[in-house]
Amino acid sequence: MIPGDKSETDIVPGLLSVLDDSPAKIAPAPNAPQSTGRRTTLARWLTSPENPLTPRVMVNRIWQYHFGKGLVATSSDFGRLGESPSHPELLDWLATRFAGKSERGHSELVPWSFKSLHRLIVTSATYRQSATNPNAERQQLKDPSNRLLWRANIRR
């Protein structure tokens, strides 16, 4: 699109078609009739319990903060073009708990609580493991980049 070129068609707002092909339902905010309602619709979609992407991205960023690399290494490209998760079941499990859901209907975490998620991660065996490992030579041959988290990465 070239600035000032009005020959192009109007762009219709929508949500991520990879997740939902249906058109976005955008209604003006009731308390702001002069608003188009686009930002409100986006905010509601991002925080919707049916949106699986938001808790997965948030969990991945917090994991990246603690371990130096996210469960999805390309945390800025969290989709088909990025890398797949190194531990998809762990990412789903953490995201489900973070959003306040679990198999039993309740979660061990306070829903959407960053503090609870940080506590869960830093008290895990994975976080507390040593940077040295008695089986380091054998593990190094199997997983030289430590993608499987067999030891703690040294960070400054």
Model-flagged regions — what are they?
Residues M1-R156:
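Primarily short, surface-exposed interaction patches in extracytoplasmic proteins
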